[in-house]
Amino acid sequence: MIFGAVLAGGKGTRMGNVDKPKQFLTIGGKPIIVHTVEKFVMNDKFEKVIVLCPEQWISYTKDLFRKYLPDGSRVEVIQGGAVRNETIMNAIRYIEENYGLDEDTIMVTHDAVRPFVTHRIIEENIEKAQQGVICDTVIPATDTIVESRDGAVISAIPDRKFYYQGQTPQSFRAEAFKRLYQELTDEEREILTDAAKVFVMKGEKVTLVQGETFNIKVTYPYDLQLAETLLGGEKKC
């Protein structure tokens, strides 16, 4: 079975003085999280689309989906974790308790604040995961990448052609993630930023899915303005 996991645990502190997490801010008259979940619900390969958010926002999130997603029977809202990968583990526990977990259980994990993910990107993630391949959605780095170990002086300027910017989805077999994550030490878990790094740290091959420059993560106030523009273009297509 294939499950979507929409990660909505962010608090939106970088968005400035807002009264709710950024995933609940609106673009085009609808909350960002609704736009994102709609993209997953449109794909009938998902058994369930699991939305993970802070405990205090669960009821609010359910109300949003009742309002904006009349056919939301495949959407389940549950509590996320303190950090990203703990949130993914919560999704795996939900799957295990309600559907069972085996080596063919696939998860397509995605940021709630990336509402412009395309059908093509989701499909390619699913196809690779069904082949037993771990995958990460990326785009080539277009700016020069500068490394600084102290935040003040350049340590190195690596060759840009070997570097990519990570996006989401990230997709994999849920059982493999659970096993590898449980093997990590506390120190290893502290340096993790996403699911792909769990596999890389354990020596597993992670392949690339070509993302899109417009598959942006809405993080800062400027991103909201850009998202409104992108949404206008999306509606014209």
Describe each PLM feature range:
Residues 1, 47-49, 74, 133-134, ...:
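Residues at the starts of beta-strands that form the adenosine-phosphate
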Residues 1-59:
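N-terminal glycine-rich phosphate-binding loop and ensuing alpha1 helix
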Residues 6, 33, 91, 111, ...:
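Residue-level signal for inorganic ion chemistry
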Residues 26, 116, 171, 217-218:
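Short aromatic/basic micro-patch
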Residues 34-103, 184-187:
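Conserved N-terminal catalytic core of the sugar/cofactor nucleotidyltransferase
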Residues 100-113:
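Short beta-strand-to-loop acidic/aromatic patch adjacent to the donor-nucleotide binding site
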Residues 103, 116-209:
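Conserved core of the sugar-phosphate nucleotidyltransferase
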Residues 215-237:
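Hydrophobic helical membrane-anchoring modules
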